[in-house]
């Protein structure tokens, strides 16, 4: 899992570094506006016998830069702040939950010109010092290994304190998971209230009229993916082998406004873990390879930031025979959660278009795409996926 967490972190940092590289035009150059934040809240209990948490306290140093219009997409997202937040987290149980250090690339967007609320989202990595251990820490089902993803979603308000400083206050949710690549993987979900202080400058935002004349065209994506996971439930089959899976996706891209793309398509996947289970348990007498595949139709939205984008897709299984057969064999098919997971699947991902023109907004047709995705069935992580595709 360490290599996959590092690859996701590298992609996020690549986005930050690319967008923050020096601009020759001083009028639109990004300005450094750091902040310090404190978050206090509760760790949502995942299972009845997990280690008890008295509280959750997280301290953050946010190294952010305010954009002023060096790229055309900046004004479409109300001139966001881009940067990284360094996190120290304590979970109120030093013996079994310990502490974590996180490094989260973030994107911060203001609500509107006349409002003082802001939204912040970030995807990064964290190292935990007390993960699951079969001998010394057998009940920490939250975190299965030292390295995981760490994400933050914040809604907060700002109040001026002076010409140079702002007071931040609001609510945040932190999530950590390894994408089912190492079990157990219940994941940590922490709900917090936060307060902080940030610096500010008073430069002028630059608006470009070029956004008004760009007309994006519809395209069709063909994408290949390589996934990885451990086979089993969230807390069962600990220590098993990792399995690859192979994914073929086809979908239509329809530009939406000037910063988004609507998606509708189909994904077919082959799971080597399914095939191994079918053979070892003699689950079927024939068509073992066919029954190790799944078929999904989905709809999604892609938020485009220059050469980068964030995708969210919601899908419906049309073909998922192995999962249903396995749950019936285990005697758990009657559970509502299992029935929902047999029909719903979702993906989120970060994408990079290496040859896309920097200020072409949501014109994706004729471009190569590389991406990393997390896939879940309902809310239970399923796998981590590397992708490469082309928009025709």
Predicted regions located by residue number:
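Membrane-embedded beta-strand positions of outer-membrane beta-barrel proteins
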Residues: 34-38, 82-84, 119-123, 153-155, ...
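Short loop/turn motifs that connect adjacent beta-strands in outer-membrane beta-barrel proteins
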Residues: 23-31, 69-79, 111-117, 160-165, ...
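Solvent-exposed loop/turn segments connecting transmembrane beta-strands
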Residues: 48-55, 76, 90-100, 113, ...
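Transmembrane beta-strands of outer-membrane beta-barrel pores
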Residues: 38-44, 65-67, 86-92, 123-129, ...
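Gram-negative (and chloroplast) outer-membrane scaffold detector with strong preference
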Residues: 78-129, 254-324, 329, 352, ...
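Outer-membrane beta-barrel translocator domains and adjoining extracellular loop/strand segments
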Residues: 46-51, 95-98, 131-137, 179-186, ...
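Residues that define the transmembrane beta-barrel architecture of outer-membrane proteins
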Residues: 30, 53-59, 78, 97-103, ...
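Outer-membrane beta-barrel "beta-signal"
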Residues: 61, 189-208, 348-350, 381-392
């Amino acid at each position: 899992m360490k290599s996959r967490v590092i690859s996701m972190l590298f992609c996020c940092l690549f986005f930050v570094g690319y967008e923050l590289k020096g601009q020759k035009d001083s009028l639109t150059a990004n300005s450094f506006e750091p902040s310090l934040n404190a978050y206090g809240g509760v760790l949502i209990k995942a299972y009845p016998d997990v280690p008890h948490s008295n509280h959750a306290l997280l301290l953050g140093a946010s190294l952010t830069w305010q954009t002023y219009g060096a790229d055309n997409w900046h004004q479409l997202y109300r001139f966001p702040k881009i940067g990284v937040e360094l996190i120290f987290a304590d979970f109120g149980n030093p013996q079994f939950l310990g502490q974590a250090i996180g490094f989260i690339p973030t994107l911060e967007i203001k609500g509107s010109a006349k409002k003082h609320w802001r939204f912040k989202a970030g995807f990064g990595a964290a190292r935990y010092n007390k993960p699951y251990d079969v001998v010394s820490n057998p009940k920490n089902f939250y975190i299965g290994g030292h390295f995981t993803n760490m994400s933050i979603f914040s809604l907060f308000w700002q109040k001026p304190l002076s010409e140079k400083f702002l007071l931040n206050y609001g609510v945040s949710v932190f999530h950590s998971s390894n994408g089912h690549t190492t079990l157990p993987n219940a994941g940590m979900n922490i709900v917090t209230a936060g307060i902080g202080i940030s610096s500010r400058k008073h430069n002028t935002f630059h608006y470009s009229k070029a956004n008004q004349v760009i007309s994006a065209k519809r395209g069709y994506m063909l994408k290949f993916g390589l996934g990885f996971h451990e086979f089993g439930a969230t807390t069962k089959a600990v220590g098993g082998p990792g399995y690859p899976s192979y994914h073929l996706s086809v979908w239509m891209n329809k530009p939406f406004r000037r910063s988004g793309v609507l998606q509708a398509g189909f994904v077919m996947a082959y799971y080597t873990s399914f095939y191994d289970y079918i053979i070892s348990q003699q689950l079927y007498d024939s068509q073992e390879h066919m029954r190790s595949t799944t078929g999904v139709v989905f709809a999604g939205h892609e938020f485009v930031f220059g050469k980068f984008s964030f995708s969210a897709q919601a899908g419906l299984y049309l073909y998922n025979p192995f999962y249903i057969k396995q749950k019936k064999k285990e005697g758990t098919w009657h559970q509502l959660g299992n029935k929902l997971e047999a029909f719903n699947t979702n993906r989120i991902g970060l994408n990079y278009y290496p040859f896309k023109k920097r200020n072409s907004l949501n014109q994706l047709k004729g471009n190569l795409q590389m991406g990393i995705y997390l896939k879940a069935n309902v809310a239970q992580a399923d796998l981590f996926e590397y992708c490469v595709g082309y928009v025709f």
